[in-house]
């Protein structure tokens, strides 16, 4: 069988969509995760809640990356999550780690939750 390059792993985004999400993260980083802001957070030992909340806002919706499409998410897989987290960590390890923790928090519900729990959360 010849690989046409169109194979999509189960539960993952296609290349075009993944690149669009990564580009969105890069644009957000330029605006929210400036070097000055990141250094101030580190210096003052501040958790950048406002920046993270904006990334998770309904308009942007990065928290939906790992959620199946059947439940209103993007249907991304592990590779997609890693690409997005890697992009965030290039700028601020704290923000990348916080975002990754949010993604991991959805996994128990996706894997073991009831239909009602999946629809609610």
Label the model's feature ranges:
Residues 1-99, 120:
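Amphipathic, small/basic residue-rich leader segments at the start of a protein or domain
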Residues 96-115:
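N-terminal glycine-rich flavin-associated loop
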Residues 108, 120-121:
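Short, hydrophobic/aromatic alpha-helical segments in well-folded domains
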């Amino acid at each position: 069988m010849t690989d046409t390059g169109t194979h999509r792993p189960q539960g993952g985004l296609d290349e075009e969509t993944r690149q669009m999400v990564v580009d969105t993260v890069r644009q957000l980083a330029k605006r929210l995760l400036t070097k000055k802001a990141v250094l101030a957070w580190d210096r003052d030992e501040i958790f950048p809640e406002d920046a993270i909340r904006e990334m998770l806002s309904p308009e942007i919706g990065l928290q939906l990356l790992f959620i199946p499409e059947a439940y209103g998410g993007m249907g991304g897989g592990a590779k997609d999550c890693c690409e997005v987290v890697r992009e965030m960590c290039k700028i601020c390890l704290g923000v990348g780690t916080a975002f990754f923790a949010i993604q991991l928090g959805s996994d128990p519900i996706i894997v073991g939750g009831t239909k009602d729990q999946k629809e609610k959360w």
